[in-house]
């Protein structure tokens, strides 16, 4: 297309002011106001200019587009005035998908958030005393129940979809100290608060192999610098011994830090001290030991064949003084950073001015309280994250077969194939849960095109594209969403 021809096409586009005052747009103007309508008009006209510039529109196609201008502007208005944050169907098989919001909340948690948010609440009010209270009492009481030593705990099996409670090993002595927990807005904030409270102005000893970077360019050394503590690296990337920690301790040392390698593993010629060795060293040198678990489970994940994820209780029982972890990962609750440990250390953190800057609101407390109550009452199946982890390959296969039978068509080929689900969220990167995938191909479109069509449904369906196929893993799909997937596939076919 010649430049002068493009210029002619540009001249055929109406002005913003012309459309704003056109009789056809009077209803939209009255309904949405001049600001919203002007923005929508500019957005639609801008797209038309881009299409002309790139040669995608000729005179005939431009006239068709101008004929549908009112509809296009109306649609743009509806998009602009609707929610950007919206539900999606997660068919990726990644349970704690960070980009898709991590852990879905339990129904009780959603109900409690609404109940606590629609009116006033006793967030920081002691009803019995009639005076100001503390907001973290609502969840600290539950964490004390869950993280206190428990003997002869009842054990459930994974097959029953109810994770077993963590229990003290037979004959193991129970520690007699209490555990206190405080809440901030995410695990990075928890690490920041812990370092600032316990080590500001001093040194923190950490293994070089644990200086991790996770999503969003979050690096442990950067957080440490912000905390006011000085990083003292010991060992090498693949091998660090307890002697390396001991040699590094000076009068400036304030804290020993263990960081869980959340999203990668080091294998082969490796060595690192055990938690027991670090605890013994910390006690001998009268230093606090803090462990950043990252994800942080409240149940034993080995029943799901998930290895390499220590529980919060495991760390506390081993003698770690402060454990930091996330609320919206393996715990299955809202986004939050949790610090559990020695009450005297927690008291110091509560008195830190940084704590107020990092504290969470009533909605987070409500969602977390309801989630923790499910743990206390052993209603583990009510927590979607734990329920998804407990699903068997056979259960997933039956659901996938039902969708396949309902949506099968000559234009679309579907079959079931073996695959693996991931925990995600940086948890247990090498653990893969056996699953059955619904593999889909379509004669008239590529896998990428089919995937795009699925994402444009309401709610959007997000799967994986591998080897020219769209793969849907129902492990991360809520059962009530199965019919929505079947309907979408039928409409595409």
Which sequence ranges carry the predicted segments?
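Intrinsic disorder/low-complexity segments
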Residues: 1, 148-179
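Long amphipathic alpha-helical segments
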Residues: 1-78
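Short Gly/Ser/Thr- and Asp/Glu-enriched loop/turn motifs at secondary-structure junctions
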Residues: 13-14, 89-93, 331-334, 433, ...
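Long amphipathic N-terminal alpha/beta scaffold segment
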Residues: 55-105, 112
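Glycine-rich phosphate-binding segment of PLP-dependent enzymes
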Residues: 91-92, 104-128
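Conserved PLP-enzyme active-site core in the AAT-like
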Residues: 130-150, 177-374, 488
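Conserved PLP-dependent catalytic core of the aminotransferase class-I/II
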Residues: 206, 364-365, 369-424
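Conserved C-terminal alpha-helix-loop-beta "cap" of PLP-dependent enzymes
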Residues: 397-480, 484-485
